Amino acid sequence: MLAKAMSLLMMFLLVLVIGSVMVSADDAPACPVGTKYDDVLKSCRSLLELQG
């Protein structure tokens, strides 16, 4: 039960991170949003792998 709650919390935090990345991409046009989004996806995959 606790693990399920933790995974839900992590997913919620990732959604917040993705949202903030999309917003901050407008402030920094030098860095394309695609690369930032890929970094977020990679960290999400690694988190899911850690949870098994």
Swiss-Prot record:
The keyword Transmembrane does not apply. Keywords: Disulfide bond, Secreted, Signal, Toxin. It comes from the Eukaryota. Residues 1-25 form the signal peptide. The keyword Secreted applies. Belongs to the scutigerotoxin-01 family. GO terms for molecular function: toxin activity. Contains 1 disulfide bond. This is U-scutigerotoxin(01)-Tl1a. Coiled coil: none annotated. GO terms for cellular component: extracellular region. It comes from Thereuopoda longicornis (Long-legged centipede). Expressed by the venom gland. Disulfide bonds: none annotated. It is found in: Secreted.
